[in-house]
């Protein structure tokens, strides 16, 4: 089973991306993606 999660930028805290995540994984998703507000690649973490 997969669920929809939202990713937010660690620098500016904007919620820029949504993606699917497997429910069996316990740790939070952490991906380096482009933030259009910061205008650079930053770490994006899964939000609640």
Swiss-Prot record:
Keywords: Ribonucleoprotein, Ribosomal protein. GO terms for cellular component: cytoplasm; ribonucleoprotein complex; ribosome. The keyword Ribonucleoprotein applies. It comes from the Bacteria. GO terms for biological process: translation. The keyword Ribonucleoprotein applies. Pfam families: Ribosomal_L33 (PF00471). InterPro entries: Ribosomal_bL33, Ribosomal_bL33_sf, Ribosomal_zn-bd. One of its GO terms (molecular function) is structural constituent of ribosome. HAMAP family: Ribosomal_bL33. Belongs to the bacterial ribosomal protein bL33 family. This is Large ribosomal subunit protein bL33A. It comes from Bacillus anthracis. The lineage of its organism: Bacteria, Bacillati, Bacillota, Bacilli, Bacillales.
